[in-house]
């Protein structure tokens, strides 16, 4: 069969311009990647991953960070050196601590000499350490923290840990810096395994995977350009999501195109003719779905959080680069390789596709027999699962933001146990210098404040370091921060605790603005594409229900099963945007086919069941690939990525196998022509027309 396919390729090889076009496309892509490659490699250099980098410019804690740059020495890096021994520190332990902290002071320019703060039970001593030498240079900050950790050592029962905001930021930088390689390799491996299983070919799976890699490189270069040209915020989270989207969405588009191309090869003598027919057949649906996804993602530009606002265009770039590569480079490579790339299941010109029993025909039949019962049961199930969202763990604390326990988190735990009546994480107040004395006095009399120290002055501002009585990131500390903001008119209150408060406030505000915007934009696009009001409303309602159910499953599993002790404030918004955009993406493929069947004269029930039978396999394969790529995030060392990956992966699976297969199909059967109201298809039956090639085949 392989020899016959090669002979056929020789007889049907395109000539003239058609023969040169694929080579020209490949050459153009090679040139683009050669130019874009250096910029792609620099994307990690422009990432920012501190909490303050995520906040809106108007936030009080953001103003504190900006003003600190104006103070002598610029922004400070604050650490807490923790010495602890169960049963109490010995004289030798205290001498070791004094010697090591003196070594830190001798090796670095500190704001003040380290001063011991013993715990009441005698088990712990902490030494606050602060320096302005690294400034805003993340590498210099991390190097400072690493050097301090090399200097202070425990042993023999003496525990030594380095905590504080500076250590937490350094540990976060290391985690984000280590994401790129493992994330990419794991994603590639997962997609490769799925493509091998879907295509059952030792060669074909390599082509879309390689093209997705090219698209990933291009997207990184484009995002680097957006950062340089338009100051788009790039974070480790947004970079990770972009990679997932390029491989997930790109592979989905490849599945649709390759499926149709395989089918057209049995009808066309030449590969380039088959590819042209395949692009005409599935291209409009792919373009429409990707445009809808990109439009939904770009709604994040309305977010107040700079991290979410940057996520929108970055994710949209990933989708559009994947689309561009899969509709240009992938067709060119497939045409050049000819039919033999499908070996051993080579499609032969003039052959008839094998008739196979369709699982989706059986599933559609069950939905079609009792559509109302299926629709109600599915709706009740999604609603019941959504109730689990009320069980989501509380807001994510810094100490719980890692899936492991780095040194900085261990230090915070030790401090919380040893100093129950004192915060180990100062609140930073910046007061106008001419009113600094009054601000200092007011701060000392504010309820919940344990102590206040005056710090640096410069640029018309004076820094006050406030220690709260309550532990960091507790309700008591938040009450103290609110009281300081109310009492100190004209001053700014910041620090890690205030940053977390501002992050949660901005996230809540963004949820109320971006969610309606996404729903409206997606609904309008669907109305234009489907020429109906009912079908778009049904699709949007379905994906919203999926989002609620996915969050509910997360609420049931995050803490009891996965051990996650907090919910990232941005989780509801980001998962909503992705699930609505990606869910509607699959809905477009299915409803586009239902509409085509109805326009050919099929009755509403026949149109719905035929659409499911002919597109179900590809949509299921695409859903599995996309869910698997997002599931890769659950293996990452950051709680925010684990939660996002889990919710989106579960949501995609629910959408693929419950909503698209049963609920949308049963709704189409139950509503009959009313599904297309007020369009023409809702009023007048269409006379049967000769059947055209299917829009989407099976994998």
Annotated model-derived regions:
Residues 44-46, 82, 128, 296-299:
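A short small-residue
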Residues 48, 57-79, 86-169, 391-566, ...:
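Structured non-transmembrane domains adjacent to transmembrane bundles in polytopic membrane proteins
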Residues 53, 57, 261-264:
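General secondary-structure propensity
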Residues 4, 52-53, 399-402, 692:
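Disordered, low-complexity segments in secreted/periplasmic proteins that are enriched in proline
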Residues 41-51:
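N-terminal membrane-insertion alpha helix
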